[in-house]
Amino acid sequence: MAATSLGPGAGTVGGNDPAKAIRLIVNADDFGISESANRAIERAHREGILTSASLMVAGDAADEAVRIARANPLLGVGLHLVLVCGRAVLPGHRIPGLVDAAGRFTDNPVLAGLRYFFLPGLRAQVRDEVLAQFEAFQATALPLDHVNGHLNFHLHPGVFRVLLDEAGRLGVRSVRLTRDPLIQNLRLAFGEYLYRVSHAAVFGALSRRSRPLLAQRGLRHAGATYGLLQNSRVTEDYLLRLLPELQPGTWELYCHADEGAHRHELEALLSPRVREVLEARGIRSCRYSDCL
């Protein structure tokens, strides 16, 4: 594959002029984290606009998530790498520098990021855990639609290097490039300005670093990734503001659909008003695998 971006004019299809098509990957992260999230994801896919989900292979409800995925073959399922705020696949004695006595990663993403970057002794452990999570995904026999990370940790240089080195062997073809345009987001939503500016800066820098490396490996990514700066506030109102602004190309929107704390995101995915805008604009909902 020579092309890398699924952005404007790259590999789009639809209508009489593929270069003018608007395609939207609608993804739910944290598939398998809980039964509540699993139910929301299945409902959003069957009744709403959700096209894909990212599986936490060590999540408390991962087995149920796999059953749901098998029962819904049009749901694109990717691997949601977890290296912070979650449980590891490998036993603690294999990765003692990464997990506590209960086999869980730290809940402090800043601390984790600094340790993974500045402690060379942890790099082999990070690599082993990443590969173990890929092996766990492969054991499900589900097609790998894409790869991303919990809290977008897949763009951390230490994790990203493993992805690049092993992409061919592991069957990775599409990776989330987490770049949510700040100026556009400030126009579309309100509040949490410190969070939005800081995350735009951090992930903007990581995306700029990662983009040419993805290109070198022929790995695909969307033109932009919406949802990062919303911090689990992907609401109906936000989508009704965002969708009219989408330009030709392929874009990703991600959320954390759930029946509990994030029910507003489930409701946004089920919204008839949102579907009406999608249809009125001719926006095609798709999976990463549809864009290759």
What are these regions (language model features)?
Residues 2-26, 31, 35-146, 157-292:
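Terminal accessory/targeting
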Residues 148-151:
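Active-site histidine-anchored catalytic micro-motif
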Residues 154:
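Residue-level signal for short amphipathic helical patches enriched in basic/charged
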